[in-house]
């Protein structure tokens, strides 16, 4: 299967990612979910957490972003993720990602 879906992670300052993908996983308000090409259209509120963008069928090549929450629009052909903050954590260890997530959550709680 060679189908892909266009993924964009958009912040107020830039497009953090624009790439074709085989699958994307992210944290919605009701839990983790995945999106494949030809997905049914939907709009979902996102929690702070990881967005994993899988590039190949074996799910070995991925881009991982830590986002501050936001909203995603999904159609059969594209996924737009709008967020205030998107940090590329693809090459970080799990411990480093956990630290960044805690820092982000603290920043978000301080803003409220």
Swiss-Prot record:
GO terms for cellular component: plasma membrane; proton-transporting ATP synthase complex. The keyword Hydrolase does not apply. Its main location: membrane. The keyword Cell membrane applies. One of its GO terms (molecular function) is ATP binding. It is found in: Cell inner membrane. F-type ATPases have 2 components, CF(1) - the catalytic core - and CF(0) - the membrane proton channel. CF(1) has five subunits: alpha(3), beta(3), gamma(1), delta(1), epsilon(1). CF(0) has three main subunits: a, b and c. Belongs to the ATPase epsilon chain family. Produces ATP from ADP in the presence of a proton gradient across the membrane. This is ATP synthase epsilon chain. It comes from Rickettsia peacockii (strain Rustic).
